[in-house]
Amino acid sequence: GNRLARRFETEVNQFAGISMRDRPMSEFDALVCDLWHGCGMGHLTLDWSYGASGFLAVKLDHSPMEDIGPKGHTADDLFTGVLEGFFGYFSEPGLLCVQTGDRRLGDKEGTTFILAFAEVIKKVESLRAEKISHGVIVARLGSD
């Protein structure tokens, strides 16, 4: 994820002549989502509205991993590391990612993740251990 982010930043900066870090968030979001889809990694949706609460909610549709592995296996767990490395490159050190839902396991909200720092991730992991859905986790974190 980190190497992908570095290459992405270098190539976009060279092409556009404007640093990725100086772009409005809406442009950054559009470029990242286009990159994700263009690399065949599915359709990424980022909910930036929870940034002030210390986390980002992420949804991945049409993941290439959805049909791989035995039934009951968390198919997109490898994307946890890719997301963590990619977004960690653009953030403060210590950004972590937890998968909070998987379409293959029947999660109605689809394949979902939370990006946050350690304090929030501890809460996410605790809620996930209780089998709490992504939407409820997001609502609880957003109200803290």
Annotate each PLM feature.
Residues 77-94:
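Active-site helix/loop of acyl-thioester processing domains in fatty-acid/polyketide metabolism
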